[in-house]
């Protein structure tokens, strides 16, 4: 018999609807829905009215780390549904002007260092990407998806074999407007 003890509880704000089925947590607010799978043998989630309780079967550093991570992820889900996440990136070039556009679920970077073939970066999840002048704005309700999309864009402009202190062309994250 496992002795489950409450490790942490998260209060759900008014207007949010939470459902836990098995190991999947689904949170809805204002017509938007986000869900995430939380599966672990030592930690489980229990819905109790307007709170989500994180119960743990052990009290060691590994389990405490999982509890803290899950609490942070649930709080980020609530914050994402309420306010959203928006990152801002800057297009930086010295000689060859880059053309950045969004086509479907990819960001296309043309004329990077005068290259003939365009570079692409994947847009993850329900993230929206807009390009205005020399700025790229990434917005969405999932912090993980927004951050991963920004990383994909920044990684697609890496120049291999050159000193990055000298060749500073690329698209760089300048603001996490959370």
UniProtKB/Swiss-Prot annotation:
Pfam families listed in its UniProt record: Ribosomal_L6
Keywords per UniProt: Ribonucleoprotein, Ribosomal protein, RNA-binding, rRNA-binding
MF annotations from Gene Ontology: rRNA binding; structural constituent of ribosome
Biological process annotations from GO: cytoplasmic translation
The organism's place on the tree of life at top rank: Archaea
InterPro entries xrefs: Ribosomal_uL6-like, Ribosomal_uL6-like_a/b-dom_sf, Ribosomal_uL6_a/b-dom, Ribosomal_uL6_arc
Entry GO CC: cytosolic large ribosomal subunit
Subunit-structure text: Part of the 50S ribosomal subunit.
Matching HAMAP family: Ribosomal_uL6_A
PANTHER family documented for this protein: 60S RIBOSOMAL PROTEIN L9 (PTHR11655:SF16), 60S/50S RIBOSOMAL PROTEIN L6/L9 (PTHR11655)
Family, per entry: Belongs to the universal ribosomal protein uL6 family.
Function in brief: This protein binds to the 23S rRNA, and is important in its secondary structure. It is located near the subunit interface in the base of the L7/L12 stalk, and near the tRNA binding site of the peptidyltransferase center.
Protein name (record): Large ribosomal subunit protein uL6
């Amino acid at each position: 018999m496992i002795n489950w003890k409450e490790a942490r509880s998260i209060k759900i704000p008014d207007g949010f609807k939470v459902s836990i089925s098995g190991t999947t947590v689904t949170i809805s607010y204002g017509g938007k829905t986000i869900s995430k799978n939380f599966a672990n043998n030592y930690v489980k989630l229990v819905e109790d009215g307007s709170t989500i309780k994180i119960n743990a079967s052990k009290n060691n550093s590994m389990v405490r780390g999982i509890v803290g991570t899950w609490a942070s992820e649930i709080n980020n889900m609530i914050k994402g549904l309420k306010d959203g996440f928006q990152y801002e990136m800057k297009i930086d070039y010295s000689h060859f002007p880059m053309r950045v556009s969004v086509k479907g679920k990819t960001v296309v970077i043309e004329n990077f260092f005068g290259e003939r073939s365009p570079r692409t970066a994947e847009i993850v999840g329900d993230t929206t990407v807009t390009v205005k002048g020399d700025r790229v704005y990434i917005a969405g309700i999932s912090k993980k998806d927004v951050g991963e999309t920004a990383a994909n864009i920044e990684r697609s402009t890496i120049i291999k074999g050159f000193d990055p202190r000298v060749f500073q062309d690329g698209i760089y994250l300048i603001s996490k407007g959370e």
